[in-house]
UniProtKB/Swiss-Prot annotation:
Keyword Metal-binding (UniProt): yes
Extra information: Reaction proceeds by a ping-pong mechanism involving intermediate methylation of a conserved cysteine residue.
Protein name in UniProt: Probable dual-specificity RNA methyltransferase RlmN
Any one Gene Ontology molecular-function term assigned to this protein's record: tRNA (adenine(37)-C2)-methyltransferase activity
Location of the protein in the cell: Cytoplasm
Gene3D superfamilies: 1.10.150.530, Aldolase class I
Active site per the UniProt annotation: 83, 328
Coiled coil: none
């Protein structure tokens, strides 16, 4: 049976105002069954229920953090598992969604990378995370105004499904998100970055997980990094900016004694010269078996100071949800074996 959420809103069944009613039930009201769509004719509801399913998930569990963040563990219909994170702030509500079960990038400091790759998520399994989190938090779906593709997986390796999900998220009759509030994070795939730049109708923001300015360190941190050199990644980032006019964000996880040397801050500043960019320095979040430690606060500040003195727009991003295993780099800590197990 087809998952209704996989469809673009323009492809939804029914016609005219009945289609608009259906879209409102799904994306505005956030109902989970066709039977609850009481202003649709009974026959239409029965027909929909015979052709489509609304729920991508078999089970949903939550782990709540003291800071208000919530990790959602989703069991998909095939038994695989993946996670999303809800992060409430005073001025906004943000959701971090996954695009894959596991991840093939294998970043050494990231728990998701240690899982390996399970499979790509469908558009509906991506969008469904937003609807499920909204429901779990007692929110209307459109109250989640900020979204980052920064959960499990490499979005640019699940390109078509991620782009379809983004178009659903932005569609005015679906979730109606602002493109300025949606960010896609990639480990740095030049072909995918250039392809994203050509998506004229999207306009979502780009973040690149760089983590080192030199090849030797980056390949130690990201074992698959040898496939694309830093020079190739930076060239693609510059092309992206030339085409879109948008700022590029660079994510930099601070690993003690690995990528936090001041000479590396100097090299990073050199790499970014002439590019309108922002650098997020992220203290590494611990997980069992990682083999890495976060840089000290003093070293992070010193690294920051070098970048700032060189004119780099830089900030230190304090991760939320550490105590719930929901912070950056911690996703997949709960039952990773089940998450990447064989399909039922």
């Amino acid at each position: 049976m087809q998952l209704l959420l996989d469809l673009h809103p323009d492809q939804y069944p029914l016609e005219g105002f009945r289609q608009r009613q259906l879209l409102e039930w799904v994306f505005v009201q956030g109902v989970g069954t066709f039977e609850a769509m009481t202003n649709l004719p009974a026959q239409a509801r029965a027909d929909l229920a015979s052709r489509f399913r609304l729920n991508p998930f078999r089970e949903i569990e939550t782990v709540r953090s003291a800071d208000g963040s919530v990790k959602y563990l989703f069991t998909l219909q095939d038994g695989r598992q993946m996670e999303a994170v809800y992060m409430p702030y005073l001025d906004r509500k943000t959701i971090c969604v996954s695009t894959m079960v596991g991840c093939p990038a294998k970043c050494a400091f990231c728990a998701t990378g240690a899982m390996g790759f399970g499979r790509n998520l469908t558009p509906g399994e991506i969008v469904g995370q937003v609807l499920a989190v909204a429901g779990g938090e007692g929110l209307a779906p459109r109250e989640l105004r900020n979204l980052v593709f920064m959960g499990m997986g490499e979005p640019l390796l699940n390109y078509e499904n991620t782009m379809q999900a983004a178009r659903i998220l932005l569609h005015p009759q679906a979730l109606g998100m602002s493109k300025r509030r949606v960010t896609l994070s990639t480990v740095g795939l030049p072909k995918g970055i250039r392809r994203l730049a050509a998506e004229d109708d999207l306009g979502i923001k780009l973040a690149i997980s760089l983590h080192a300015p030199d090849e030797a360190t980056r390949q130690r941190i990201i074992p698959t990094g040898h496939r694309n050199s830093i020079a190739e990644i930076m060239a693609a980032a510059r092309e992206y900016q030339a085409v879109t006019g948008r700022r590029v964000t660079f994510e930099y996880s601070m690993l003690r004694g690995i990528n936090d040397h001041l000479w590396q801050a100097e090299e990073l500043a050199d790499l970014l010269r002439g590019l309108v960019s922002h650098v997020n320095l992220i203290p590494m979040n611990p997980w069992d078996g990682s083999g890495f430690e976060s840089s000290t606060e003093e070293q992070i500040q010193a690294f920051y100071d070098v970048l700032a003195a060189r004119g780099v727009d830089v900030s230190v991003r304090r991760s939320r949800g550490k105590d719930a295993g929901a912070a950056c780099g911690q996703l997949a800590l709960k039952r990773p074996a089940a998450a990447v197990g064989a399909s039922a």
